[in-house]
Amino acid sequence: MLSLDLVFSFPAWALLLVLTLLYTLYLATTRLLLSPIRHIPGPTLAALSFWPEFYYDVVQRGQYFRQIDKMHQTYGPLVRINPFEIHIQDPSFYPVLYTGPTRRRHKWLWAARMFGNNTSAFATVRHEHHRLRRSALNPLFSKSAIQRLTPHLQHTLARLCSRLDGFAFTRQDVDLGIGLTAFAADVITEYCFGQSLELIGKDNFGKEWIDMVSAPSELGHLVKQCPWILVVCKWAPKALVRALLPGVALLFQIQERMSAQIQPLVDRAAAVDKPADPLTVFDFLLSSTLPQHEKTVDRLKGEGQTLIGAGTLTTGNALKTIIFHVLNDPDIFRKLRAEVDGALENMDILSMSDTAYLERLPYLSACIKEGLRISYGVTHRLQLIAEEPLIYSGVTIPAGTPVGMTSIFMHDNPVVFPQPREFRPERWFEADFETVQAMNRHFVPFSKGSRMCLGMNLAYAEIYLVLAVLFRRYEISLSGVTREDIEMAHDFFDPAPKEGARGLIVQLQKRG
């Protein structure tokens, strides 16, 4: 009784201070003294707390990758960047971490939940569960499947060209970056649902929808740190959520749209005993051998959110980056135009059976690889957990430790890619064989291993077709755009330019 009286006689602020000190002591003991990764070098504050990452990624908006780079400059290639995670900045370790299906690699739940869904193959934590979900999707994005999709890509690209012809006729500036992102969105939505969004025909290429799809990318930093926010917001009045956390409101809006798109497909699949040949991604999944609990609307809406986001934003950004750098260097533009004109004379690109011929054009291919390298693909570190201890440079990384690597540091490595921030397509065919092989090993815009990007073949097909058609069909010039309007300034999982960036504004003129 006396002890309780003593506690309640304390001022509230004093009690709070004591509890805070005790909690800090507990964290210091468990995270600094008892942690299985206490031997990994790194800043003490980062080992003690997630606050540094919160500050740089949430408050400063996607800047923690810069701090990680500074940590590596201070502590070396192996760094502890938060209480539980290690980051490695050494290209030679990439195939060890991002390995094939024979080595079990799990995702880290703390990171996997950043987009507010855990039902997509991308966000699946356990290795076996991911393999189940991914195996159902793989046939849809194989090289042969994308070849069969070529007429659909050409039809959508023809619609984009028809729209761009109007800008060419009026000599009006056009945001080609948004137009190309709309093209990618129309392609992936029609492939997923059998119905395109028709963004190409909308005012401003449906930029509002593209902004909505982009919103969860930046929001992911906050959700990762504070997952309870989504739970609270689901119960809060929608008007309040829109006012206080518009990114959360947009995320919920995307998820509602995914449910609305998928529900009719689920109903249709349930209504027939023997479905016809599947026409869309979700028709295929619903007719697959996946267990029934993997075919619910709640499960598949997460798959839809991931496929639409990845299939829209990363392809659009890659195209925007490549076209800017080609136009920004007259010599590169001249070489690419000469190759495309010479190789495709008297050929109709929009009626080719596939992109194999385009893929054999050396300078076009080099421009694409260099653009993918310099735009990074996904810019956020991709953490995986190995079941076995990993050894790096004689240091043991305990089993069960989240380990991440980042495409930015892979692609900007000056040893592998001299003058890494220069857009230089020639590096891919002028170097000797061993150097090119080394560059290929460290070229990871789609990551590698069993969890590499599902849509790589689709992205390549879109990029080859778009570049060949645009540079054959139009004279294109930049309209007051600088590299800062294109280049990554924020890591929102996907790369994002600086606030107020103009984008890829161009003028078009149809060639004779």
Swiss-Prot record:
Membrane topology: Single-pass membrane protein
Protein's pathway: Pigment biosynthesis
Organism: Emericella nidulans (strain FGSC A4 / ATCC 38163 / CBS 112.46 / NRRL 194 / M139)
CC cofactor: heme
Record InterPro entries: Cyt_P450, Cyt_P450_CS, Cyt_P450_E_grp-I, Cyt_P450_sf, Cytochrome_P450_monoxygenase
GO MF annotations in UniProt: heme binding; iron ion binding; monooxygenase activity; oxidoreductase activity, acting on paired donors, with incorporation or reduction of molecular oxygen
GO cellular component, one term: membrane
Binding-site positions, heme: 453
Top-rank taxon, per record: Eukaryota
Pfam families xrefs: p450 (PF00067)
EC code: 1.-.-.-
Family note: Belongs to the cytochrome P450 family.
Sugar-bearing residue positions: 118
Organism placement in taxonomy: Eukaryota, Fungi, Dikarya, Ascomycota, Pezizomycotina
Protein localization: Membrane
Residues that span the membrane, as ranges: 6-26
Keywords: Glycoprotein, Heme, Iron, Membrane, Metal-binding, Monooxygenase, Oxidoreductase, Transmembrane, Transmembrane helix
BP GO terms, sorted: secondary metabolite biosynthetic process
Function field: N-acetyltryptophan 6-hydroxylase; part of the pathway that mediates the biosynthesis of the gray-brown conidiophore pigment. The first step of the pathway is performed by the nonribosomal peptide synthetase ivoA that catalyzes ATP-dependent unidirectional stereoinversion of L-tryptophan to D-tryptophan with complete conversion. While the stereoinversion is catalyzed by the epimerization (E) domain of ivoA, the terminal condensation (C) domain stereoselectively hydrolyzes D-tryptophanyl-S-phosphopantetheine thioester and thus represents a non-canonical C domain function.
Protein name stated in the entry: N-acetyltryptophan 6-hydroxylase ivoC
Main location as per UniProt: membrane
Matching Gene3D superfamilies: Cytochrome P450
